[in-house]
Amino acid sequence: MNSTLRKWFPLVLFAAAPALLFAQEKQAAPKLTNEQMEHFLQTAKIVKIKELSVGVTDSRRANLDDGTLQHSAHVQSIDEHKAKFEGERGTEMNFVDTWMYNIAAYRLAGLLDINDMVPASVERKVDGKPCAVTWWIDDSMMEVDRKKKGLSSPDPDAWNHEMYVVRVFDQLIWNTDRNLQNLLIDPAWHIWMIDHTRAFRLYTSIKEPKDLVMCDRKLLGKLRELDAKSLAALKPYIGNGEIKGLLARRDKIVAFFDNQVKAKGEAAILYDRPAR
């Protein structure tokens, strides 16, 4: 559970057919835009909901139906705020674990043009409580299961390029809970980042500088564009303190990669991640 991201770059052992690796659903969902997924999540009827056996409390899977499309969603209502929290990773002051950060992470991913790696998430009341309702990634396996089975991506370069995005994003949002259950792998071996309820800390430092290795060229450009005005799109799910910390970390991340490019050259540091 506490493995670092650096340990998540396997050598290619073999390429297995996705149909053998993932449990298939009866009918694949049609390709939708993010806006269409958001609308579905906010308006479709919840026909069934149950607690998840994996993960934290206040986490459920709902089956949604709008009369045309049926799809599942991840429903989270956790909203804890503690002055002091004692966890397995030590003591944390000003601890926050909230559904609101899931929506903030999705909106931030949109600003960075990496919302093809963070599933759509919207606010909706479920059983009278405000929740984050997040698009369910069909036919996926968790990173923890991939490691247990000894499976590796058939395209190590594509895998690494997506994992570098994960690293940069987690340092930007100061994610304290990126574990092997919070990364999903779909049948095309694309990585999805989920469950950001313990992110957006107030710190201005970088949590794990060693995790910054390479960066997608477009992502670096989008990082430069972030400012208080654009990040207002994340409110009310994060406040001014979280935005201030995020921008300070952004400055450090951009400066780090700029210095690395000067020292090692663009080819060693920057790459172009293809569209998914």
Could you tell me what each predicted segment is?
Residues 22-276:
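Phosphate/dinucleotide-binding and metal-coordinating scaffold of catalytic cores
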Residues 10-20:
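Bacterial N-terminal signal peptides
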Residues 1-12:
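Bacterial N-terminal signal peptides that target proteins for export
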